């Protein structure tokens, strides 16, 4: 419904039109302006009414073409948007010349130059008509009035193709900028807090590490002190062990085949020893393990040999020294083999591919070299007696001989005046034999020569027992030792072997032969003699020695109870009656006093006699003579019984002495062969 007095309506393309869109066509020329009188100010619509009118116009867009605002107005078109500017007559910048024609388009700064105080009399209406070349042909129109400060949006039909223009004021921009600033501030605050937290964590960790480093430094200082104290203590114990080691080496040197048996009986080292090594080890006399000048640097092993047909070295040394990395590096002296005795030549001849001890000794690249050296140093050399007695050797030979003697002799006999009661004697002797057997087994099994190297409390018991056993073996075979009758007995209940220095008077053995009850006193004394001499003979069986005469000479037999002096012919041992206490006292005084006493009691001849006793030849000789001893004991028993019957009628003091004296003589003859009866 076009009106002639109104401007030309905006051409709006229809949606159903099939004509192509003309995007590049120029806009149509503006319609001619008509002069219309302005209504008075009282009749002019208020901003609220203008807003309502604009809303009504917006609702009418879907019915017909959009109508321009009432005249006068100014058309501005740019970028496909046509704007109609309607000014009131009283508004500043109103030119009355515009009423007659199009006039000039107001500048774009008009809206900015109009103060709010001058708008109270009139209003400015701005209409936007969007002419977008879209296929849907939808337009967006928004009318803003200076009287209304809020954004006003013209809402058209609810379609997907609808275009909406939103005009925001400065308050929204300010709020958005404030929100952005707040977000940035919160983000900076959060970053600052995270940075401060990281710094605090780093400082806390640094303080913890400093405390840990200080504690570790203190611990290192304590470790250094402990290491120095340990080295001092180790040197001290080495000095304490030295006299015992020298004494042990002296004894071992006179035992043939000691080290070869010890090496072969060791389960770990015997793997390296072949038949040729066994032949070479028969010439081995001593093994020593010594620490270097500084204990922490390492140690060395020395093997001493006799003259042998295999090599010319008398001593071969293998040294283990720690390098800077703490690993043991070995060096050894070259072995000067005789021609044709080298290990390589022997292996080619015998086709023996097994390991050899001397190959290990000369080779320094074997991975198990350090382990074998540690076994020799910490196990074999510390206690070689244990491995020597494990299979074969002194202990097994003694047990074998003792078992044979037990099988041959079911009971033991002793010469007593009332010997006609054989059943009573059998019961007594069986009890005594069981007691002595238990005591002998307990004490012999406790002998460990080298245990003193590991504990200091073991010195006072084990070493003294071994000393007593060695002295007994030496003194029993000494040719200068006079053999006589003894009416005093030795109390051997607390020692391993019989010691001639432990002779003391027994109150039960004191016989004056002056009373009528001499027969009963002799019976009691003979019982005591039986017990003590039974222990002596059992120990003699274990050591294969002849110790039939344990008492003093006839000159010292005065029957005094207070006689505390020694009963041996050796004048050096007449200082006391208890050799065990004296040895302990010597040990407490120092190694020098102990060595001095040792030199006075032992000599080279004694050790040579001991070797003869321990050797296997002596064991075989004893087996051959055991039967002769049993026959001799029976013959002597018959002779003494006949002799006693002939002399029984004599009733004087001399006759009593003559009747008692043959009894020890029979004991002495039996004890030489290690047999009781």
UniProtKB/Swiss-Prot annotation:
UniProt feature, compositional bias: Acidic residues: 543-581, 606-627
Subcellular location: Nucleus; Cytoplasm
Residues modified as Phosphothreonine: 333
Bias type Pro residues, positions: 25-44
Residues in cross-link Glycyl lysine isopeptide (Lys-Gly) (interchain with G-Cter in SUMO2): 11, 158, 160
InterPro entries per record: NAP-like_sf, NAP_family
Region Disordered, annotated ranges: 1-54, 175-202, 469-658
Induction: By TGFB1 or serum in pituitary cell lines (at protein level).
Assigned GO CC terms: cytoplasm; nucleolus
Keyword terms: Cell cycle, Chromatin regulator, Cytoplasm, Isopeptide bond, Nucleus, Phosphoprotein, Transcription, Transcription regulation, Ubl conjugation
Tissue expression profile of the protein: Present at high levels in the pituitary gland and at moderate levels in adrenal gland, brain, testis and ovary. In brain, expressed both in mature neurons and progenitor cells (at protein level).
Entry keyword annotation includes RNA-binding: no
Biased composition (Polar residues): 484-493, 526-540
Biased composition (Basic residues): 178-193
Top-level taxon: Eukaryota
UniProt PTM: Phosphorylation at Thr-333 impairs function on cell proliferation.
Residues recorded with modification Phosphoserine: 18, 648, 652, 655
GO biological process, alphabetically ordered: negative regulation of cell growth; negative regulation of DNA replication; nucleosome assembly
Biased composition (Basic and acidic residues): 509-525, 639-650
Function: Part of the CASK/TBR1/TSPYL2 transcriptional complex which modulates gene expression in response to neuronal synaptic activity, probably by facilitating nucleosome assembly. May inhibit cell proliferation by inducing p53-dependent CDKN1A expression.
Extra remark: Synaptic activity down-regulates TSPYL2 protein levels by inducing rapid proteasomal degradation.
Subunit structure: Interacts with histones. Interacts with CASK. Part of a complex containing CASK, TBR1 and TSPYL2.
Family affiliation: Belongs to the nucleosome assembly protein (NAP) family.
Name of the featured protein: Testis-specific Y-encoded-like protein 2
Species this protein is from: Mus musculus
